[in-house]
């Protein structure tokens, strides 16, 4: 399984923490970094090198489909460009604001094939507007694109970056969340849904217990949250909920672990000696 990220240099510091956490908890074949052509991220390469994991830098080509979009929208589609991997294999795409806190061995063996080449997590709460305008099976069938597991060959036969961009342009009235909506629409009924522990969004955190979506009366999937917390593997600091922006009194162990890794980034060679999350919590 290859670890895959797509970003520009504005997110390099976040991605360095993310990569360190993933490589601490799982052995990947390589780290693949997709960026604009003039944004080679040397610090990320140093982090991967510290773990003795090869890095492949993939600059976005000038003829990429995302260049059809206004410049301010193009960064949202870096992740879509990254889904086009020419080397056959299993890839785990992750956003730069994610954090791995457990082993990912179960993702290595999860069946992916021509019928379901992509696996992702539901938002974990009803999204009736998205299901209606995108033709999804239910209000829970809208997935978050911050963590995507896919087979590169099978996915390429189903969807291309050009198709996602074209859908986003032609269905702009329906795509509230741009690339995420377009991808949901194009691969609907072909997604294998993962449990929430592989993409714990900010609203799902225990500190958000007062959120209405934690109430089973408003959200049937709220009953799953205790199991998600117990089996937690990937945290997504979505909606800007990065530990540096959250008051310390609200920090949970995963926030403090993120900060520990962040503070160690000045010396990449030291990163492999840092404890995994479960050991650090003892």
What annotation goes with each model-predicted range?
Residues 31-37, 120:
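Short internal beta-strands
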Residues 40-86:
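Active-site-proximal specificity loops/subdomain of glycosyltransferases
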Residues 59, 75-127, 149-150:
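GT-A fold catalytic core of metal-dependent nucleotide-sugar glycosyltransferases
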Residues 69, 132-138, 220-224:
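Short, P/G- and charge-enriched loop/turn segments at secondary-structure junctions
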Residues 21-29:
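Short, acidic, metal-binding catalytic loop of nucleotide-sugar glycosyltransferases
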Residues 4-7, 17, 152-282:
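A glycosyltransferase accessory/donor-loop signature
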Residues 1-11, 64-68:
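Glycine-rich phosphate-binding "P-loop"
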Residues 136-147:
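A recurrent flexible, glycine/aromatic-enriched loop bordering the glycosyltransferase active site
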């Amino acid at each position: 399984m290859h670890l895959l990220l797509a970003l520009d240099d504005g997110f390099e510091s976040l991605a360095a923490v993310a990569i360190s956490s993933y490589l601490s908890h799982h052995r990947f074949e390589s780290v693949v970094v997709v960026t604009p052509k003039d944004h080679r991220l040397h610090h990320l390469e140093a982090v991967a090198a510290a773990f003795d994991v090869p890095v492949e830098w993939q600059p976005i080509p000038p003829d990429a489909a995302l260049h059809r979009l206004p410049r301010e929208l193009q960064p949202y589609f870096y992740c879509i460009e990254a889904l086009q991997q020419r080397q056959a294999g299993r890839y785990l795409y992750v956003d730069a604001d994610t954090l791995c806190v457990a082993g990912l061995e179960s993702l290595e063996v999860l069946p992916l094939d021509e019928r379901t080449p992509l696996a992702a997590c539901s938002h974990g709460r009803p999204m009736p507007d998205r299901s209606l305008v995108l033709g999804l099976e239910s209000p829970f069938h809208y997935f978050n694109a911050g963590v995507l597991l896919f087979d590169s060959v099978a996915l390429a036969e189903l969807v291309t970056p050009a198709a996602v961009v074209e859908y986003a342009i032609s269905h702009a009235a329906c795509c509230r969340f741009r690339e995420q909506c377009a991808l949901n629409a194009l691969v609907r009924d072909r997604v294998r849904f993962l449990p929430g522990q592989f993409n714990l969004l900010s609203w799902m955190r225990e500190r958000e217990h007062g959120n209405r979506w934690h109430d089973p009366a408003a959200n049937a999937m709220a009953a799953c949250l205790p199991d998600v917390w117990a089996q937690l593997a990937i945290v997504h600091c979505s909606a800007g909920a990065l530990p540096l922006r959250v008051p310390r009194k609200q920090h949970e162990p995963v926030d403090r672990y993120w900060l520990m890794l962040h503070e160690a980034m000045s010396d990449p060679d030291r990163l492999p000696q840092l404890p995994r999350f479960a050991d650090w919590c003892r």
